Regions:
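PLP-dependent amino-acid enzyme catalytic core
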Residues: 1-157
Length: 157
């Protein structure tokens, strides 16, 4: 029986059939699978399937850890703005987590970085600020630090 059919019949009892009100609660709920055919005899080989995270990325775990740490330290409250200098993956995950938690998210990216990644963050509710390509990562970090300091935003690290 499919997960959906089980939910409709009221007897879906496996973790993969749970219904969540908060996408961040699914982060890290990734299976470990024993690889039977690729490992040499006598070797137990396991893989952690991180692509089961909401955005199919290990960066989902990092993003929720950064946000929860900021919340525990009292640096993040409803309505806060989170800013990060990013090449994309962590920023995408932070945009998702911030959208769920009620924070504004701003990513600082160099103009040389992927246009596709720059498009995903606004789709998740984030804003993207572009820095000149020749400044690279250093320029991104400097801009993020400057904006965090000047505007009182939470700098994701």
């Amino acid at each position: 029986m499919s997960c959906f059919a089980g939910i409709l019949k009221g007897n879906a009892n496996t973790r993969r059939c749970e219904i969540y009100d908060d996408i961040t609660k699914t982060i890290g709920q990734t299976p470990i699978v024993k690889v039977n055919k690729l490992a040499p005899e006598g070797v137990n080989l396991y893989v952690k399937c991180e692509y089961f995270n909401p955005l199919s990325s290990v960066k989902d775990r990092l993003a929720i850890a950064i946000i929860e740490d900021g919340e525990k330290r009292g640096e993040l409250k409803l309505g806060s703005t989170v800013i990060e200098a990013t090449s994309g993956n962590t920023g995408i995950a932070l945009a998702m987590v911030c959208a769920q938690r009620g924070y504004k998210f701003v990513a600082v990216m160099a103009a040389s970085l992927s246009i596709e990644r720059r498009k995903v963050m606004p789709a998740l509710g984030g804003e993207v600020i572009i820095t000149p390509a020749p400044l690279g990562g250093t320029g991104m970090v400097q801009k993020a630090e400057e904006l965090a300091e000047r505007r009182g935003w939470f700098l994701a690290r």
